[in-house]
């Protein structure tokens, strides 16, 4: 009977076709990587000692989002009866950041790469569509601007880790007006300048030296606005540069490469996460680097450039590292990164209210996926079959979803990570197929509620991550294009 009811509910809430009448001049999508419902809640508890305390948790539109990749599914009944339904990491079960970003940025599910469908065909991104509409566009991240999430909105590649190729594409071919992130080849993970920079003409992960030198010298660009003239990139690097860019006149195109993270040989780079001494600590036990801008400072710099366009803009802003905190089982580190993200959300809200309005700007807050399977102590009663087991195995009748323990403000909540990935070590955890939260406010926000796919027994109504693209494109075009483009 329960299964039948679930099926009927899913049918009743099938996504409806989008109609005209809702439009937005600007769309801001803010993504906290690897932060599901319990990561948000843990940060609430740590910051304020109570749930529901972030400003976005009072937004008028709040939904769940399914995140599965091509070939996957989300079953709201099984999700709450069997840990294995949302755990593990089979290719068609649990998404990666690149796949989730591609879904949100193109409306297509994929099985790998960025900006492609499940058959490896190149598909239009929302950045490209916004550019066709005459809008300014940007991507901002606390890791490399060529990494999975920003790349999924702004590039096309079969290999998500072909960062050298993605950088070339973003700087030389795309019409992006803003690209900001870390992985500066001249600086280590502590923001200290290197005697020998990390360049390579062969490694797919690292900057090509000639590209770096040319872009810093103002020699790379293309016709980004269709006026027949080349718009070259202006490069900013220091925290003071980012802070200054937040006010006053700006160049037409800005590449911000934070002075940090160049020694990450797999190209991710981070503004804060790999600073020396920071491990499984309470938040900010090792203070954030003073040399790296906060995500708030990066966001305000980007907005000050993008709002020069009278036709409006699209920007994706990512807080990248709740994900890695949760991968290592370091909840305190995930919380400090989420606090940085929360501060950025508040800064963006203040910017909208001072420089735009909710009548013309849509703000969407969400995540690409949950990481770690975070629950309270005692969750998932049962033990892995063996230390080398391929995934955390729990029988359905043993699945216990224990809430986090609120230890009060300033204290890390009582918790347990449940989704081990054993081949990476006993204390490494992976993405899950749990729903993630979405919060929205502003022009066209209510359109998201027309795309509800089903009702989760715990999280309530939910949409799919591909619907974020559909709604973004819809509010930009006021329904002037066919509603369904994706293959979901």
Each predicted region: which residue ranges?
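Surface-exposed amphipathic alpha-helices with a cationic face
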Residues: 126-131, 349, 353
């Amino acid at each position: 009977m329960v299964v039948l009811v679930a099926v009927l509910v899913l049918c009743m809430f099938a996504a409806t076709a989008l109609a005209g009448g809702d439009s937005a001049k600007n769309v801001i999508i803010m993504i906290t990587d690897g932060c599901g419902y319990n990561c948000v809640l843990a940060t609430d508890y740590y910051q304020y000692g109570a749930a529901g305390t972030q400003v976005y948790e009072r937004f008028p539109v709040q939904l769940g989002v399914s995140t599965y990749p091509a070939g996957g599914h989300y079953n709201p009944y099984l999700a709450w009866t069997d840990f294995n339904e949302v755990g593990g990491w089979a290719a068609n079960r649990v998404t990666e950041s690149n796949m989730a970003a591609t879904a949100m940025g193109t409306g297509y599910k994929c099985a790998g790469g960025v900006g492609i469908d499940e058959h490896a065909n190149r598909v239009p991104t929302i950045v490209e569509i916004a550019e066709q509409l005459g809008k300014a566009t940007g991507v901002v991240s606390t890791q490399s601007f060529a990494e999975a999430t920003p790349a999924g909105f702004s590039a096309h590649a079969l290999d998500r880790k072909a960062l050298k190729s993605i950088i070339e594409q973003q700087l030389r071919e795309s019409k992006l007006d803003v690209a900001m992130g870390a992985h500066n080849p001249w600086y280590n993970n502590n923001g200290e300048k290197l005697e020998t920079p990390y360049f390579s003409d062969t490694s797919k992960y690292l900057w090509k030296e000639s590209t770096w030198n040319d872009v810093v010298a103002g020699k790379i660009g293309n016709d980004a606005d269709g006026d027949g003239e080349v718009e070259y990139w202006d490069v900013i690097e220091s925290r003071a540069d980012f802070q200054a860019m937040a006010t006053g006149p700006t160049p037409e195109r800005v590449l911000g490469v934070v002075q940090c993270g160049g020694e990450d040989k797999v190209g991710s780079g981070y503004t804060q996460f790999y600073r020396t001494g920071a491990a499984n600590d309470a938040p900010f036990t090792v203070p954030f680097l003073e040399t790296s801008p906060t995500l708030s400072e990066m966001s305000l710099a980007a907005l000050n450039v993008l709002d020069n366009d009278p036709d409006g803009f699209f920007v994706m802003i990512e807080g990248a590292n709740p994900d890695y905190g949760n991968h290592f089982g370091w909840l305190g580190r995930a919380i400090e990164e989420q606090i940085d993200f929360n501060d950025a959300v508040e800064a963006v809200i203040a910017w909208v209210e001072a420089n735009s309005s909710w009548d013309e700007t849509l703000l969407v807050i969400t995540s690409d996926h949950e990481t770690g399977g975070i629950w309270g102590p005692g969750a998932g009663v049962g033990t892995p079959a063996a230390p080398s087991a391929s995934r955390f195995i729990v029988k359905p009748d043993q699945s216990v979803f224990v809430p986090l323990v609120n230890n009060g403000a300033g204290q890390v909540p009582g918790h347990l990570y449940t989704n081990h990935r054993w081949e990476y070590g006993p204390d490494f955890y992976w993405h899950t197929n749990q729903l993630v939260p979405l919060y929205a406010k502003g022009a066209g926000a209510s359109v998201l509620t027309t795309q509800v796919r089903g009702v989760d027994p715990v999280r309530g109504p939910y949409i799919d991550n591909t619907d974020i693209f559909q709604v973004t494109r819809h509010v930009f075009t006021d329904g002037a294009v066919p509603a369904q483009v994706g293959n979901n």
